[in-house]
Each structure stands twice: as structure tokens, then as C-alpha cells.
Amino acid sequence: MPRSRINGNFIDKTSSIVANILLQIIPTTSGEKRAFTYYRDGAIMLAQSEGNYAEALQNYYEATRLEIDPYDRSYILYNIGLIHTSNGEHTKALEYYFRALERNPFLPQAFNNMAVICHYRGEQAILQGDSEIAEAWFDQAAEYWKQAIALTPGNYIEAQNWLKITKRFEFE
């Protein structure tokens, strides 16, 4: 069973108390309550940057097993992708971002993170002297950034600038 993590931070404490009260009064199944508990505990650990990603992943994996709502699952899968990104496990991260987007195609942050990974891989290919592979990665990054920007036009200004500079997208 996950342990509740409430530190001395007033906002964290308040959020945890409110979440626990809502969990008790909102009509939900026991499986949904358990999924939320695992999700909340995983999210709290991640947000507090305790560095215990293995435990956070265990909570998120358990939450995905218990959570049936596709929208809620999308955020759990997205957060798993974040941990894999932080750990430098880019292939796994991409897999979880894809899975999140299958359930919720309106996650611009997932598209952005996928673009960042592809852009990084393009830069790595350049360092290895493979410009053809680099261009393929950069093109893929551009496609993901276009999707993120389409969902939230006022965001991702650096990505928009990169797309303009590299002539991968024209903005009005």
C-alpha cells in the first residue's frame, strides 16, 4: 500500500488534506480510490523531487493497473514518461507519451516532450557525424512541436522560433 507523503509545506499539506476529503465524499469505486491514492502518492513524490523515482514508478504502475478512466490514465502515463525522461530513458519515455496521447490527444506537453527528445537525438546524430539521421530526428521534432503549438498557440515560443529559423513551419 502506498504511503502518504505530506511534508512541512503548507500548500502540500493542504492539497493532500483536500484530496483525502474529496476522495472520501465523491462517489467512486474502491478500485478508483486506490488508483487515485497511488497516483497522488506518485505525483507527490515526483513533485517534491525526492529523487526516489523507482518508488514513484511503482505507484504510477499500480495506478495504471487500477485506473479505468482513459483521461485519468493519460496523465498517469504522461507522468511515467516524465520519470523516464528524467532518467535518460528516452525510448521508454516516448512509449509512455504515445500511450498517454492515445487516451488523450489534447496533451500539448506530451507532444512538446516528444519533440524535445527527438531534437536531442538529432543533435546527438550531428555529433556522431550522421546528418541524414539528424535531419530525420529534427523533422520528427518539428511535427511534434507543430501539434503542441496547434493545441496551445501562445505557448512553446522557443519551438516556434526554431521552426521558423529552420524553415520547418511558417506562422501567420
Curated annotation (Swiss-Prot):
Family: Belongs to the Ycf3 family.
Mode of membrane association: Peripheral membrane protein
UniProtKB keywords: Chloroplast, Membrane, Photosynthesis, Plastid, Repeat, Thylakoid, TPR repeat
Subcellular location: Plastid, Chloroplast thylakoid membrane
Protein purpose: Essential for the assembly of the photosystem I (PSI) complex. May act as a chaperone-like factor to guide the assembly of the PSI subunits.
Stored InterPro entries: PSI_Ycf3_assembly (IPR022818), TPR-like_helical_dom_sf (IPR011990), TPR_rpt (IPR019734), Ycf3/AcsC/BcsC/TPR_MFPF (IPR051685)
Top-rank lineage group of the source organism: Eukaryota
Protein name: Photosystem I assembly protein Ycf3
Entry's Gene Ontology cellular component terms: chloroplast thylakoid membrane
Cited SMART domains: TPR
GO biological process: photosystem I assembly
Broad class of the protein's primary localization: plastid
Pfam family, one: TPR_1
TPR repeat feature ranges: 35-70, 74-107, 122-155
